[in-house]
Amino acid sequence: MFRKLAAECFGTFWLVFGGCGSAVLAAGFPELGIGFAGVALAFGLTVLTMAFAVGHISGGHFNPAVTIGLWAGGRFPAKEVVGYVIAQVVGGIVAAALLYLIASGKTGFDAAASGFASNGYGEHSPGGYSMLSALVVELVLSAGFLLVIHGATDKFAPAGFAPIAIGLALTLIHLISIPVTNTSVNPARSTAVAIFQGGWALEQLWFFWVVPIVGGIIGGLIYRTLLEKRD
């Protein structure tokens, strides 16, 4: 079990460090900034690379909504859920702490003012989208993500391609929803940066736990009841 938890911790660290790091350090860099598309690709690449690296150890969840969604879909034991979630949150926080340390080396850096890649709705949405818009996009995309994960890892799916499908799905999810919520679909990712933003991000954090997890459960149940092929 320790190896599984370590894999989830390292995998989530990589996701937050790579994905949020691209948003904090590279997205707005003068003239050469990578923009929304670059950040979306970075998140997808973090999952793709770590799924290949440690997916064979832990399953490569790196996300509490994925762990709980896989449990809802009958693919993951309930007794391991809490341990996985804790490992994911710890890995994310360590990554965010290192990002904060790096970003603080630039004169004028202010995590509270910049948002530090935090997720938000209403006045804290990158595009000014309402709480209802945030609810719909996070719910639908979290459910869709779990559908992709269940399908790509199904025993009838082509072997060896799951990390590619899942990484591309996460890229697509970010391309759709960065303007709406800055894209969560992952409570561990949201928690990690919210701690260092320290203000409104913590006040809205509950939303980015509840909605992605509910969406993940919906996705898991849809695949289990309607799409999964029975022997």
UniProtKB/Swiss-Prot annotation:
It is found in: Cell inner membrane. Disulfide bonds: none annotated. It holds the Pfam family MIP. Residues 1-8, 55-81, 152-155, 223-231 are cytoplasmic. The record marks F43, H174, T183, R189 as: Selectivity filter. SUPFAM superfamilies: Aquaporin-like. GO terms for cellular component: plasma membrane. It catalyses: H2O(in) = H2O(out). Gene3D superfamilies: Glycerol uptake facilitator protein (1.20.1080.10). Induction: By extracellular hypoosmotic conditions, especially during the mid-logarithmic phase of growth. This is Aquaporin Z. HAMAP family: Aquaporin_Z. Its main location: membrane. CDD domains: MIP. Keywords: Cell inner membrane, Cell membrane, Membrane, Repeat, Transmembrane, Transmembrane helix, Transport. A motif (NPA 1) lies at residues 63-65. It is a multi-pass membrane protein. GO terms for biological process: intracellular water homeostasis; response to osmotic stress; water transport.
